[in-house]
Amino acid sequence: MLYLIAEWLGFEGALNLIRYQTFRTGATLMTALVIGLIIGPRFINMLRVRQGKGQPIRDDGPQSHLAKRGTPTMGGLMIIVSLVLSLVLWMDLRSPFVWACLAVTVGFGLIGFLDDLDKVTKNSHRGVSAKVRLLMEFLVAGIASYIIVSQINTWLYVPFVSDRAIPLGPFYYVFAAVVIVGAGNAVNLTDGLDGLAIMPVIIAAGTFAIIAYLAGRVDYSEYLGIPHVPGAGELAIFCAAIMGAGLAFLWFNAPPAAVFMGDTGSLALGGALGAIAVASHHEIVLAIVGGLFVFEALSVIIQVFWFKRTGKRVFRMAPIHHHFEQLGWSESKVVIRFWIVSIVLALMGLATLKLR
């Protein structure tokens, strides 16, 4: 909104700063952070009053988690509100990428909200059926993919290799939707410990802020040999909003958590990262930067497949973070070590920009 107003006024005087994406990226991060810190306590109190028992805690999970009973969930609402308000304020709202990513964020957030609401209402950890949830997710992702792909080509670019791209044609629409849905659910599976999911999301968003900015610049993209995506620079501002809102949420989610983001937040943030990766044409890089989320999702897939096939478990408990808890690692040790892994993976992802 401010960008359009400043443009209408001719970017006169101090308004000229708003012309630059780098300035708006920093301003968006700070705005989302401040909004989140201001509304956080009110949101948490409201959720605590309305939910009563809070998020249901599984009896068959780690026994240390039983102490978390009564902690409110749906904290993802404050993330989404902080993110959306800061974006409306600072982004160029004419960008189709903005609306596609916003559609995924809000749409997936709504799906997660319905899932959380069902869990809280029924005091059960099951929520909405997986088939119904996936159907709704693919519907939202399909719409967003259509908007995004109308602005970019349908080639899949391979990192670490010069001038190597795979033409997917119409199948790219399906591929894009799978990336978005997969990212949303991978982050959702990672969100099982205080602070575990939100910091890797912040790290991934920071990494993609750099990638999106570079992809949006003709000079940098040509120098690095990465696909140039006109208008992708605005996605750096979207990433900054995720970072700011995420940091504000972490303030309240730090152990012991005062609130859980729930499926409302994890699906929204994961889906947003997937949409940003598709729009910036760095889908494979997302699998590297978000490798922790991939690892968590694979641990569940492997556990379920192997148990159905043999009746035995590969891990003591899935997702994998619970396996390490069962090995005797404290929750804080699991969380911090997984954060370290996320930082290393982010650096590896950035290395793909130059290593050919």
Curated annotation (Swiss-Prot):
GO-annotated biological processes: cell division; cell wall organization; peptidoglycan biosynthetic process; regulation of cell shape
EC top class, as a word: transferase
InterPro entries hit by this protein: Glycosyl_transferase_4, PNAcMuramoyl-5peptid_Trfase, PNAcMuramoyl-5peptid_Trfase_CS
Pfam families in the cross-refs: Glycos_transf_4 (PF00953), MraY_sig1 (PF10555)
Assigned keywords, A-Z: Cell cycle, Cell division, Cell inner membrane, Cell membrane, Cell shape, Cell wall biogenesis/degradation, Magnesium, Membrane, Metal-binding, Peptidoglycan synthesis, Transferase, Transmembrane, Transmembrane helix
The reaction(s) this protein catalyses: UDP-N-acetyl-alpha-D-muramoyl-L-alanyl-gamma-D-glutamyl-meso-2,6-diaminopimeloyl-D-alanyl-D-alanine + di-trans,octa-cis-undecaprenyl phosphate = di-trans,octa-cis-undecaprenyl diphospho-N-acetyl-alpha-D-muramoyl-L-alanyl-D-glutamyl-meso-2,6-diaminopimeloyl-D-alanyl-D-alanine + UMP
Cofactor(s) annotated in UniProt: Mg(2+)
Subcellular location: Cell inner membrane
Record keyword Lipid biosynthesis present: no
Membrane topology classification: Multi-pass membrane protein
E.C. code: 2.7.8.13
Residue spans crossing the bilayer: 27-47, 73-93, 97-117, 138-158, 165-185, 195-215, 232-252, 258-278, 284-304, 333-353
Keyword Ribosomal protein: no
Family indicated by similarity: Belongs to the glycosyltransferase 4 family. MraY subfamily.
Name assigned to this protein: Phospho-N-acetylmuramoyl-pentapeptide-transferase
Organism expressing this protein natively: Erythrobacter litoralis (strain HTCC2594)
The encoding gene: mraY
